[in-house]
Amino acid sequence: MTTANDRPEEASKLSTEELLERIVALKKELNAVILAHYYTVPEVQQAADIVGDSLALARAAEDNSADVIVFAGVYFMAETAKILNPGKLVLMPDDHAGCPLADSCPEAEFRAFREQHPDAIAITYINSTAAIKALSDITCTSSNAAHIVEQIPPEQKIIFGPDRNLGTWLSKKLDRDMILWQGYCYVHDAYSEVYMIQAMAKYPDAELIAHPECRDEVLRHASFVGSTAALLDYTVKSPSQSFIVATEPGILYEMEKRSPGKTFIPAPKDPANPRSVCTQMKQNTLEKLYLCMVNRSPEITVDENLREAALKPIKKMLEMSA
């Protein structure tokens, strides 16, 4: 039986199986839904009701009958869930799990950036804070970014941020000039062309697949570029039996689960910049997931005026990608 004063030292004595059992019971007690990103640890994905990329999770946050949303991801994801569900309790296993990409775009600096380009609309990656969303016209994810940009008239100038690599990929794919904010995801930006070529030589039968947050020098060698969900879908449908996967390796858990006969090779690290794991996503442990449900904390809150402003570009995204 769980109580609101369960302590971390007590939860740490529970086995994975015991934690999973208690989480199932708590879901019923709270009428909760657990959402987890593909980059979280396998046991958290195992506990989740829905595992997905940013777009799938945003849709799941909007379309559910739960009273409580437990979001295992990074802060902007749980914040987005709260923006979409002001009347629901939104919990997060670790509210210190931030996103350096989102943090690379401060509100005051982005506001000034927009003021430098008054005739441009701002399309911002969902990997951004509520304050940045509130300054934007449309939000997007890597799953729907190309589809959204394609709907903007060609004569309309576009500011895109905060991820410069995703913006560069979109510009080349769509032959569309955009004004780019110079942020990046440290995980994807760390992959280098030299080590990718070496991996392709070492595994000649493997297809290189990559997330568009990678640098252009890496993407040009990939046989397929897509969002986390698109990469997963590609590996299921492709006749290839082995893949070099240039994205955060948390996705390999789901890839191996869906295609148990195939081989998935994490893209190699550059020794000079070996940050190929999102440490913030990994802060969401099964123990923290359990404790946040027991204690109904940490709770995610958003100022109502900010929430209303940030909701508009998110709703616009969902409408344009329906």
From Swiss-Prot:
Pathway involvement of the protein, from the record: Cofactor biosynthesis; NAD(+) biosynthesis; quinolinate from iminoaspartate: step 1/1
This protein's record includes keyword Transferase: yes
Coiled coil: none
Subcellular localization: Cytoplasm
InterPro entries for the chain: NadA, NadA_sf, Quinolinate_synth_type2
Keyword Transmembrane helix annotated: no
Free-text cofactor note: Binds 1 [4Fe-4S] cluster per subunit.
One cellular-component annotation, GO: cytosol
Domain of life of the organism encoding this protein: Bacteria
GO molecular function, one term: quinolinate synthetase A activity
EC number: 2.5.1.72
Cofactor: [4Fe-4S] cluster
GO BP, sorted A to Z: 'de novo' NAD biosynthetic process from L-aspartate
Catalyzed chemical reaction(s): iminosuccinate + dihydroxyacetone phosphate = quinolinate + phosphate + 2 H2O + H(+)
List of residues binding iminosuccinate: 37, 54, 125-127, 142, 211-213, 228
Main subcellular location of this protein, as a coarse class: cytoplasm
Residues reported to bind [4Fe-4S] cluster: 99, 185, 278
Keywords: 4Fe-4S, Cytoplasm, Iron, Iron-sulfur, Metal-binding, Pyridine nucleotide biosynthesis, Transferase
SUPFAM superfamilies assigned to the protein according to its UniProt record, in alphabetical order: NadA-like
Similarity-based family: Belongs to the quinolinate synthase family. Type 2 subfamily.
Function (record text): Catalyzes the condensation of iminoaspartate with dihydroxyacetone phosphate to form quinolinate.
Name of the protein in question: Quinolinate synthase
